[in-house]
Amino acid sequence: MKNSTLLPALFIGVAMALGLGSLEGSAVQGILPYIAGGLSTSSDHALWTLTYFIVHWSLGITLMPWSTARFGARRVFQGAAAIAATGTLVSALTHNLWIMLLSRAMEGIGAGLLVPLSQSLFLRHSPTARHGMVTMLWSNAMLIPFFVGPAIGGWLATTLNFRFIFWLSLPLWGLAWFLGRTGIPAGGENRDNPPFDLLGFGLLYAGLMALQVTLDQGEQYGWWHSFYILHTALAALILLLLFAWRESRAPHPLLQFHFLRQRNYWLGLLLLCLGWSLFMGWAAELPLWAEETLGFNGYWGGVLLLPIGLAAVPVSTLMDRLQGLFGLRRLATLCFLLFAAAYGSGYFSPQSGLAEIFWPMLLLGLGLGMLFVPLTMIILSGIPAEDIPKAATTSNFIRVFSANIGVSLISVYAIRDGALASNAFREHLLAYGNSSAMTAPTLAGLVAAQANTLSIDNLLRLSMWLCLLAALMAYAFLIPPRAIVTPGSPRSYVEEAEEEVAPL
């Protein structure tokens, strides 16, 4: 293990970089109208600054195993921090949407490299007996910015300018780069490393970008009524199928899909993606709805998400103890029951305030605090220790990209359902007449507010039923890790962690 005097620099620098990557993704969630104004575009197009960050965040994850083996952990960390900092600088300077999307892609690539790299460094430079605690610290470093980022971004956007999100991040990236360079040991380069799967990466990149265009622009062009969207969707399908075929035959693939043959891996990953994508989708949609319908500014729209962090952080710190008391499968089930309770208890009106939104968000935070540790350990259960980095890279890629699907689909559903409700209200007014003394613009505003809120409530009910189904699947079909351990099987981090917290 590395000299213990340099470990604080390693942990602080790596955690700071990981948190900054998450912060730059989350800080824009509640200020899309402000970004739209700064870039002279619409809020729908401003949403691309979030979705393009996420898609490149997931792509960055696939680069980490090969680049670390080829260049060493320290050089990869420095490169990732430098790429993200460069993107941050361009984001702070540009007034053009397309240049902003390019800079957000750079930020996403850098942040994506840091996700599996930071997890690997944390586990490699800590005792085995502390792996459970280190995993909790790693997940908090990644998640806490998602809770506080929207409020920070909202405050900066309303008091200064949304570009200060990027200006203030720049010196922190520099500090993280310096601490990481000081704490991460040099070496680890392997010039005989197998060649990078450039063809596979090209197919994956092109496929994900075609899928992203379909998700982002489908509503604008009328979905399947548009040949443009049909062609981009077909291109995405063909390219991603070619990528899967390529990975199954490549001697050194980017992603290892054969792990999906294990029940705990694919089912645990499916549940993790569902919980994470729903959270990310609502974290983007609720602040936007509050600003456009309730009249909140960017700061108060971001404050809506703070109760999630108030509950999630304390619960996540107790996961070492809770998994020993209840077991991983029961915790995963309870997580989705809490999600269902949060989405089911959220019933809003155009007159709702923070008090009505606080308790559903608090319940959501309780569930989110239980999401990562039990499902991550279930996903990795039964996998030999030497294969865990490959399995974790594949699962992290799929989980991160699932957030993009959640953000896009929840946004599209809210828009479409709101439009349907608005049309129904207008037809009712035309049929029965307007007996009030309201002017036409005032009445139109009330109809839009009611329709948008009804759409949010319907989507909350749908999310509740999805989480209830997920809870049933978790309890009925996940296999507790202890049940699949066989005598003489290769030891893994999951087995060790299970033994450490086993109740007396």
Label for each model-derived stretch:
Residues 395-504:
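Hydrophobic transmembrane architecture of multi-pass small-molecule transporters
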Residues 7-23, 28-32, 41-52, 58-65, ...:
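12-transmembrane solute porter fold
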Residues 170-189, 205-217, 235-249, 470-481:
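C-terminal membrane-cytosol helix-exit motif in multi-pass small-molecule transporters
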Residues 66, 70-71, 93, 151, ...:
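Membrane-interface helix caps of multi-pass small-molecule transporters
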Residues 94-95, 127, 183-186, 215, ...:
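Short helix-capping/hinge motifs at transmembrane helix termini and TM-loop junctions
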Residues 44-48, 98-102, 106, 159-167, ...:
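Interfacial loop-to-helix junctions that mark the boundaries of transmembrane helices
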